[in-house]
Amino acid sequence: MKVIVTKSYDETCTVIANLFRDLIVAKPNAKLGLATGGTPVPIYKKLIAMNEAGTLDFSGVHTVNLDEYCGIDGTHDQSYRYFMNTNLFDHINIDKNNTFVAKGLGDFEANARELEAKVYEGGVADIQLLGIGNNGHIAFN
């Protein structure tokens, strides 16, 4: 593990966005583990700006998100699929068929198996973005 100390949240977001950029440039078919919530939004904005500037190409990238709310469809404004579309996917040149957010409706056990398969399909994520909450939680747990 590498620990990087920064002076501000904005600097932290810039460092993280640059880590993602460097990975994608080096490995255009990178697999990204992504997160939802407030923490990653500024990072996503920086990645969008890089894509819009033509310095970052998401066309070969694959993504996996690790959670979704049960009982709501991906078009619901509280779903994580909706969050990812609104905050990142709709603004970059990624093939949405290469993005995975677990289903919130249907057979939850089958959905969990599908999520597990996607996590390991083609190897684990090359990089994983997770938030740390003010109460110490990591990711959504």
Where do the language-model regions lie?
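Ligand-binding beta-strand-loop-alpha-helix segment within the catalytic cores
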Residues: 56-128
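Electropositive phosphate-/nucleotide-binding environments in soluble metabolic enzymes
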Residues: 6, 10, 14, 41, ...
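Redox-cofactor binding/interface segments in oxidoreductases and associated redox assembly factors
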Residues: 34, 128-130
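Generic structural signal for well-ordered alpha-helical scaffold segments
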Residues: 17-25, 48, 52, 85-89, ...
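Glycine-rich N-terminal segment of FAD-binding domains in flavoprotein oxidoreductases
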Residues: 26-51
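N-terminal glycine-/serine-/threonine-rich phosphate-binding loop
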Residues: 1-32
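Class I SAM-dependent methyltransferase SAM-binding "motif I" and its flanking Rossmann-like core
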Residues: 135, 139-141
